[in-house]
Amino acid sequence: MAAGLPPDALGRRGSCGTDYGAVRYVGSVSRTAGIWLGVEWDDPQRGKHDGSYEGTQYFKCRHPKGGSFIRPNKANFGVDFLTAVKDRYGLNDKQDVQYGTGNTVVFGTKTVEFVGMDSVAEQQRQVQLNKLVDISVRECAVSHAGQEEEISRTCANMRHINLSKNLISSWETVIAIASQVQNLETLNVSENKMRFPSTSTLISSTFSNLKVLALNQTEITWTEVLLCAQGWPVLEELYLSSNNITVLERPDNVLQTLKLLDLSDNQLLDGNQLHLIAQLPRLEQLILRNTGISSIHFPDARFGCKTEMFPSLKRLAINDNKISQWSSINELDKLPSLRALQCNNNPFMDTEKNPETLIQLIIAKISQLEVLNNCEILPAERRGAELDYRKIFGKDWLEAGGHWNPEKNKPSEEFLASHPRYPALCLKYGAPEEGELKGRQPLTLKNQLLTLTIKCPEKPEQKAVEKKLPESMTIQKVKGLLYRLFKIPGSELKLSYESSKLEGKEVELDNDLKPLQFYSIESGDCVLVRW
């Protein structure tokens, strides 16, 4: 074995410069002298081959160009946890001079010797380490725990540890470090490609106080998550992005305290996988960004009813997915606690070219939503969205069997499947009147654009802006636009306008359901906003 090469090098994580990888082979290579390490690199572009050389397969790689051979002296197998902490926080032996550890001091012509200065410096280091509560040793080449109980003696007050992007090879190493931290609450071991237990292990109290755990890019599977989770009795936040998790399983008797789950950047088999985690009783936030899901369905609840799945879910992120049908957005109204939604970059959003109408449709379809794509939904904006929705689809409602007379009102199942909230909106605002029922008008050149100046006369700090708006745009939609434009808090807007042709005359825009053209507004006029 080469000098300095760890006896357990095979299978361990290591680095060479800024590149990380796992040792898959230790030994000789044909027609060369000495020992070589066969490394499968995290970044395949760093490699040269699949583990074979001159017709001999020395090790296997997942990528055809993911492997190469390096000499042992080029490999860094890392340091123990405490060494990394001392290096990161400037508390190792090299910094002893700042504590005055020289043994002699000269006073004039006399040299005075101070006995025990080394031990004093060591005590001062101990005190400094014991004060650390939040510790980050990200990218510090940590590979093992070090001497037994050394961490617990030295860093007794740690609560939050960032161990991301190191050289940790197995979950056992994480346990060896964490078991010496009595009150560990937050642990980040992301970007360590490590081995996890494949069978049930003895449950220890290592993570008895752990509330936040990040395992992004660790190659953990959902089965391994559930096995390890037996030791996470009070965990509240679990981050699992970019782990190639495709299939979920029901978490029986584990993760019952979980409030946040991040599964982003894992290509789930289908949306039905979500049903397997739908009974987590305390889950409030679910992050499913870029998981490949194309539909969402809660089959236990009919139109207009609430599902028993995800009973506590308040915040849902489904952005960057393949959801193409509005029916999935309809389904989200079945979630009893949903308050915030992120859904950008899904194909269904391309079905409506006017972004204002798109936002209104989503708001109208999900009754309890308060935040959409990180923007607060104000009461006036919701009211306008629901009134417009009720009007836009009024003709479809009538043709499907809807009627102003409750006894004759029998819309078809097909209509209710497409517009499950429509009956509730009719109850809330009344059935639409015949004069309101105009077909949907796409925003085209036929809808004349008005160039208007928008001012806030009572708010001089707000600069006037110029906007182009279709003359068919209702006052309610204009208000929704202005709420976002001026970031106005939840209050009632009052709009009026001054004509460029009639100086000094101000006309109040007092009917939310009327379009701009109803008030004879023309390009060049000035809209005045007050609140």
What do the predicted segments below correspond to?
Residues 1-7, 511-515:
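Short alpha-helix capping/helix-loop boundary micro-motifs
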Residues 3-20:
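Short coil-to-beta transition motif at edge beta-strands of beta-rich domains
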Residues 9, 35, 57-70, 75-77:
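Histone-fold and other basic nucleic-acid-binding segments
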Residues 11-16, 39, 452-456:
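A short beta-strand micro-motif
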Residues 19-29:
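Short beta-strand-centered aromatic/proline hotspots
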Residues 27-62:
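Basic/aromatic-rich interaction segments and small domains that mediate binding to polyanionic partners
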Residues 63, 72-269, 273-531:
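Long, contiguous C-terminal flanking segments immediately downstream of a protein's structured core
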